From Swiss-Prot:
<dbReference type="InterPro" id="IPR056443">
    <property type="entry name" value="AEP_C962R"/>
</dbReference>
<dbReference type="InterPro" id="IPR014818">
    <property type="entry name" value="Phage/plasmid_primase_P4_C"/>
</dbReference>
<feature type="binding site">
    <location>
        <begin position="636"/>
        <end position="643"/>
    </location>
    <ligand>
        <name>ATP</name>
    </ligand>
</feature>
<keyword id="KW-0547">Nucleotide-binding</keyword>
<keyword id="KW-0426">Late protein</keyword>
<keyword id="KW-0067">ATP-binding</keyword>
<dbReference type="GO" id="GO:0016817">
    <property type="term" value="F:hydrolase activity, acting on acid anhydrides"/>
</dbReference>
<dbReference type="InterPro" id="IPR051620">
    <property type="entry name" value="Viral_Helicase-Primase_Cplx"/>
</dbReference>
<dbReference type="Pfam" id="PF08706">
    <property type="entry name" value="D5_N"/>
</dbReference>
<keyword id="KW-0235">DNA replication</keyword>
<dbReference type="GO" id="GO:0006260">
    <property type="term" value="P:DNA replication"/>
</dbReference>
<feature type="domain" description="SF3 helicase">
    <location>
        <begin position="607"/>
        <end position="775"/>
    </location>
</feature>
<keyword id="KW-0347">Helicase</keyword>
<dbReference type="GO" id="GO:0004386">
    <property type="term" value="F:helicase activity"/>
</dbReference>
<dbReference type="InterPro" id="IPR027417">
    <property type="entry name" value="P-loop_NTPase"/>
</dbReference>
<dbReference type="Pfam" id="PF23162">
    <property type="entry name" value="AEP_C962R"/>
</dbReference>
<dbReference type="InterPro" id="IPR014015">
    <property type="entry name" value="Helicase_SF3_DNA-vir"/>
</dbReference>
């Protein structure tokens, strides 16, 4: 059997001693029932007793103090752990705290002769710093020693409880003692390496431990000896001193108290303060917040140990230190004491504004919750730098939590108790939240080495049932329980009293019965049900995949927030659940698959400017935030590669990020508000959506079109689900063998559309003289599109164009110069929108024109043009006026003084009339004519070109439009 460390013993013994020590039970009864009337608020000046175990503070009168001292003395004699402090009052005894660094690891002798000499020197400084009362007085000195030397460090306290001094007087005494050469010589003779700096200057006013009490995870100081010094003001030079005999016969908790005035041995001697003491000082009520936090919060104790594993750079270098502070703040607002303690590990920085920096950083962390670093990161850093020590601490933490339950409930373990330990073990790996149907849903953070589907690594996987927890309870948890058995048997082997041994025997018997439950299916299901409440992280589901710059990929998480994109293939705290199975690899144009695809793109879209624009546009599919309000309409008669390209984008992004959409979504009438629309819900959270293969002459529903393209919130619902609101984030492409019919003159709709017409056709036997006929390769459709290497290469191409778009065009598609698509869009609009055709053919911008047209005159001119060029029909003037106000003429329309609309700065041409100097057509300069199609040479690095108003690369050649 191995004895547990003192730290283990400390936390477990606190629980166990309540069961078998009647003295401890009596003390708890006294505190909870009889002394509760004397409780004070933390920080109250009335406080004189602090209970570190509970964090409660008391203002006890002298009679109740004596009762408390009696109970504490009985507990001390039984070896009970205690954590009581007394607050030093305005006048109280003197405590000197010596923290020694030794030349060796041997305990210094500190024999009575040396301690007697030390008493004389201390008294000299007392006489010099205060006014002792007239008459003869006995002054008692007590020496309490640290139980053992730890890494060359040792300590002792000098207690002078009867001498009642002001705080300022104590500080004066301590200040002069620090420079006493005789005292330093005495300490040096005891093997002390730091005699000049070992006296703690803060011991004058901080709360002092009552005798028998200790700091958390430390043994209490033990009384070495005591001395009685006699001072008579009538003969101040004669100061006899002798060692106190039978000292253990007294109530030492009472006698060594700095505030007690009714001791049997020690009687109070009140000393007048010096001049500096006349102004009453406020005595600090140091609440030892870190100690109290660690007593009450097992996780805080655990984090304290974990933080100790971090190397110095984490508290020296600002970026790493700030991450630790953010992690603590995001984990719990109560962990501020941990942040202070960790920051003080670098005294140089702490003493030069460190506290102020921590204050600011802590407040920033509280306000800016988007920086999601929590304790999970601290665990990762500690495991990374000290894996073996980390493992030991983690295992010890599980043991301590379970042991507390075992000792508190006499060995009987229930579902919640096991769940609590499981949460400590697996709380960083599993999360539970409630979904929209009110059901508890488990999520597991997938790590390397465990079974998974492609793409799940480094992401939160949804679990129908946490099977790993079921297995873990039976196979791993049993090892922790075996340590509890070992711990109980260790105590049974010790020479305890009969009642204590009987307690451990009963405990072991009950615990062995509990151990077998972890192999029972029903019991484990009960544990899992209780664990749901512990693992619950509210709104976790709502936070999943909300960062539009993060994309789950096959080998981790891709961040496109910075340029270049960054692959996160290690531990992180981004709540990512969705993913594509594609692995991210940086763009490499020399990669064979990349070369193949770049050449294929060159064949599919022969115009350089159009090819670049379309690739920029498609690259925005990897971003799931709000985008420019655009939709690409792609016309092609078949066998031209448009379907291959659109499907490849969707296949690369996967079903979580892309969706093929039903064309009826664009062509059908909108459903009523209360009806479901599963097709529309397919756009929720998607970065890409595409339509393909429509029937001839499909008429688009323009109101639905605007709703889908406009950035902003929309509402819809799935069948049997509640109405949801979500943002439209998809990059959308609609492909067809036939032109869509868009029956609107609304400029707000048309400015959101871009149109491209395929020119190339892939044939089995292409005409060598026709540059727009290419040799078909069925492998693209049946083989390449399914190849993971091909998909990875195409994904790298998308990321490359996304980065290029951000760097060169500030992420804005509309800044990309593309005369081919602009011209084709204009031509398409004119074929659909007769009003726009009239405007682009007959209305010109004429800054020098003096003629001003009433809107009714423009309506008349359009009606005459329509009847002459399109068809004779009856026009409704009011409707035409409204259409003109929503057309490209909108910016030229003004209000006249008589509140009518007028057209200014333009001129309406008559038939066969030409432009005058300074005039220009409204719309694209080519007036909708198709541009010549540039054909790129196969080896031209077309992807490096940046479209602007300059000419294309030299290797581009021109060919007539087919």
């Amino acid at each position: 059997m191995r004895e547990e460390s003192w730290e283990d013993h400390d936390t477990i013994q606190l629980t166990a001693q309540r069961k078998y020590l009647a003295e401890v039970q009596a003390l708890e009864t006294l505190l909870t029932r009889e002394l509760s009337a004397f409780l004070t608020e933390p920080g109250s000046k009335k406080t004189n007793i602090i209970n570190r175990i509970t964090g409660k503070t008391y203002a006890l009168p002298s009679t109740e103090l004596l009762r408390l001292y009696e109970h504490l003395e009985q507990c001390r004699k039984q070896g009970a752990l205690m954590y009581f402090l007394e607050r030093q009052g305005t006048y109280s005894g003197l405590m000197l705290d010596y923290d020694l660094k030794l030349n060796t690891n041997a305990v210094p002798p500190l024999e009575p002769p040396a301690l007697s000499r030390l008493c004389h020197r201390i008294f000299v400084h007392i006489k010099n710093s205060s006014v002792l009362p007239e008459g003869s007085h006995k002054i008692h000195f007590f020496f309490t020693l640290k139980p053992e030397v730890v890494q060359g460090k040792y300590g002792f306290h000098v207690l002078i409880p009867g001498l009642k001094l002001a705080a300022s007087t104590k500080k004066s005494i301590i200040g002069s003692l620090q420079h006493d050469a005789t005292v330093q010589k005495i300490l040096h003779e005891q093997g002390v390496a730091n005699p000049e700096s070992c006296l703690d200057p803060h011991s004058a006013s901080v709360p002092s431990l009552l005798y028998g009490s200790s700091k958390l995870n430390h043994k209490p100081y033990q009384l070495k000896t005591g001395f009685e010094l006699v001072f008579d003001s009538s003969d101040p030079d004669y100061i006899p001193i002798h060692q106190i005999k039978n000292i253990e016969s007294y109530n030492l908790v009472s006698e060594l108290s700095l505030t007690n005035e009714q001791g049997s041995l020690v009687r109070p001697v009140y000393c007048a303060a010096d001049i500096a003491a006349e102004k009453e000082e406020e005595i600090p009520t140091d609440d030892h917040s870190l100690s109290i936090l660690m007593l009450h919060d097992p996780e805080a104790r655990y984090l304290h140990k974990i933080l100790n594993l971090l190397p110095p750079e984490y508290y020296v270098e600002y970026p790493l230190w700030s991450n630790v502070v953010f992690a603590l703040a995001n984990t719990s607002a109560n962990y501020r004491p941990l942040a202070e303690w960790f920051s003080q590990k670098c005294p140089e920085k702490w003493n030069t504004g460190g506290k102020e920096k921590l204050e600011k950083l802590w407040n920033d962390a509280s306000r800016h919750t988007e920086k999601k670093i929590t304790k999970r990161s601290i665990m990762y850093w500690a495991h990374k730098h000290a894996p073996q020590q980390y493992k030991e601490i983690v295992e010890q933490g599980y043991f301590s939590i379970l042991a507390e339950y075992v000792y508190s409930y006499n060995g009987m373990l229930e579902h919640y108790m096991i769940a609590k330990v499981i949460y400590a073990m697996m709380g960083n790996k599993f999360v539970v939240d409630v979904d929209s149907n009110g059901k508890y849903v488990w999520f597991e953070f997938v790590l390397p080495g465990q079974p998974m589907n492609q793409g799940e690594i480094w992401k939160w996987r949804k679990e129908v049932n946490p099977d790993e927890l079921h297995i873990y309870i039976s196979e791993n948890f049993s090892r922790v329980m075996d340590r509890i058995t070992e711990h109980i048997k260790y105590h049974l082997s010790q020479p305890h009293e009969t009642n204590i041994l009987n307690y451990y025997k009963k405990l072991l018997k009950a615990f062995e019965r509990s151990k077998s439950k972890i192999f029972n299916d029903s019991f484990k299901k009960g544990v899992i049900r209780q664990a749901e409440f512990l693992f619950r992280q509210r709104s976790f589901i709502q936070t999943l995949d909300t960062n539009p710059h993060l994309l789950g990929v096959g080998n981790g998480v891709l961040s496109i927030e910075t340029i270049p994109a960054k692959l996160i293939n290690h531990f992180h705290e981004h709540p990512i659940h969705q993913y594509t199975h594609i692995c991210y690899v940086p763009f490499n144009p020399e990669n064979p698959w990349t070369k193949l695809l770049l050449n294929a793109l060159q064949d599919i879209i022969p115009e350089l400017d159009a090819r670049l624009w379309i690739m920029f546009y498609l690259s925005t599919a990897i971003f799931r935030g709000l985008k420019e309000a655009l939709m690409l309409l792609w016309l092609g008669g078949g066998c031209n590669g448009k379907t291959f390209l659109m499907r490849l984008v969707a296949m690369v992004l996967g079903d979580h990020y892309a969706s093929k959409l039903n064309i009826s979504l664009l062509t059908s009438c909108r459903e009523t508000a209360e009806k479901p629309n599963s097709a529309f819900m397919r756009l929720k959270g998607r970065g890409y959506g595409y339509f393909e293969e429509t029937n001839k002459s499909e008429v688009l529903n323009t109101s639905r079109l605007k709703e889908m393209v406009n950035p902003g919130d929309v509402t819809a619902r799935e069948l049997n689900q509640k109405q949801e609101s979500f943002q439209m984030t998809a990059t959308m492409v609609a492909a067809s063998n036939y032109n869509f019919i868009i029956d609107t003159t609304d400029h707000g709709t048309w400015r959101r559309l871009r149109h491209y017409r395929s020119k190339v056709k892939f044939c089995h036997n292409p005409d060598p003289g026709n540059p727009y006929e290419k040799k078909e390769d069925p492998r693209f459709i049946h083989e390449y599109i399914m190849d993971p290497d091909c998909q990875n290469a195409f994904f790298s191409i998308l990321v490359y164009f996304w980065e290029k778009l951000q760097k060169e065009y500030n992420g804005q598609i509309k800044k990309v110069f593309c005369p081919t698509i602009e011209s084709e869009t204009e031509a398409y609009r004119k074929s659909q929108d007769t009003l726009h055709r009239f405007i682009t053919e007959r209305v010109v911008e004429s800054p020098s024109a003096e003629t001003v047209y009433n809107l009714s005159e423009v309506v008349t001119a359009y009606a005459e043009w329509y009847n002459a060029n399109i068809n004779v029909k009856r026009h409704i003037a009011l409707e035409l006026s409204q259409e003109l106000e929503n057309s490209v003429l909108e910016k030229y329309l003004q209000w006249s003084p008589n509140k009518t609309r007028i057209l200014k700065g333009c001129r309406i041409l008559h038939k066969f009339e030409t432009l005058q100097p300074g005039e220009s057509y409204i719309g694209v300069s080519t007036a909708g004519t198709l541009l010549n199609t540039p054909i790129c040479e196969p080896k031209n690095k077309w992807w490096e070109w940046s479209p602007n108003l300059s000419a294309p690369p030299e290797k581009e050649a021109s060919a007539p439009t087919p």
